[in-house]
């Protein structure tokens, strides 16, 4: 599914694509692939890279196209082994095209779009969009970390009453989730430096926004480490 979004004091959905709009593609189907590769001439190799669930944060170029891959958090379904995970999102840009592609439904993207409308945020260019998506990823990491902390506390209380394999396995799953969060947050933080280097000679770089993003990511990173230490201590005690 794809939507065409224009920034008018926040992103507003329109019926058709025009240059410099944001094409947001989630769980792409054949029609989306055809539009991206045939109409916009997006490199097919970029779409294949984003489809790899293990893809790490990085940048790549092909001709005048830039691919930026980030990892964003998502809440898994009840049938999944881990309560939360991270998935790749790719932002593909050239001089007049901005496309984001994610092969998974997440809470982050609709919340981000709604947030720009609610706050009347003016997203000035493609770098602005990428940085704000990184910021939003940090916000959602922190939201899910609060839920993880509640799960840790609940499991601890159960273990105080009686030691059960089920509760220990629950803690192990949370510990694995924190490892994935840690790796993804660090990878997204590295991307900020790469993007600064790529856009250093342009008017796109907003140093104040960059600083805000770094601060939010560091808060998420520090929170992950605190919860990891708590979890390790709890599991060692039992």
Which residues are covered by each model-predicted region?
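Helix-boundary and N-terminal cytosolic regulatory elements
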Residues: 1-121, 151, 187, 191-204
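Conserved residues at beta->alpha junctions
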Residues: 26-27, 103, 135, 172-175
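A short, ordered amphipathic alpha-helix with a cationic face
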Residues: 22-23, 120, 143-146, 181-182
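Well-ordered alpha/beta subsegment
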Residues: 124-152
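A short, structure-level motif marking secondary-structure boundaries and short turns
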Residues: 17-19, 129, 166-167
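Short, charge-rich amphipathic alpha-helices with coiled-coil/heptad character
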Residues: 118-128, 156-162
């Amino acid at each position: 599914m794809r939507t065409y979004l224009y920034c008018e004091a926040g992103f507003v959905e329109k019926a058709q694509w025009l240059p410099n709009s944001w094409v947001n593609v989630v769980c792409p189907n054949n029609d989306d692939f055809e539009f991206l590769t045939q109409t916009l001439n997006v490199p097919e190799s970029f779409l294949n890279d984003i489809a790899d669930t293990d893809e790490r944060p990085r940048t790549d170029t092909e001709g005048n196209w830039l691919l930026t891959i980030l990892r964003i958090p998502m809440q898994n379904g009840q049938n999944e082994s881990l309560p939360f995970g991270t998935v790749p999102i790719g932002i593909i840009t050239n001089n007049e095209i901005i496309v984001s592609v994610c092969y998974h439904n997440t809470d982050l993207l609709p919340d981000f779009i709604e947030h720009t409308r609610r706050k009347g945020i003016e997203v000035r260019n493609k770098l602005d969009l990428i940085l704000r998506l990184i910021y939003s990823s940090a916000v959602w990491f922190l939201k899910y970390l609060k839920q993880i902390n509640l799960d840790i506390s609940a499991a601890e209380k159960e273990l105080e009453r009686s030691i059960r394999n089920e509760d220990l396995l629950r803690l192990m799953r949370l510990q694995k989730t924190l490892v994935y969060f840690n790796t993804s947050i660090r990878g997204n933080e590295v991307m900020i430096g790469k993007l600064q280097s790529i856009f250093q000679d342009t008017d796109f770089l907003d140093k104040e926004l960059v600083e805000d993003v770094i601060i939010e990511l560091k808060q998420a990173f520090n929170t992950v480490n605190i919860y990891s230490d708590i979890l390790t201590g709890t599991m060692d005690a039992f």
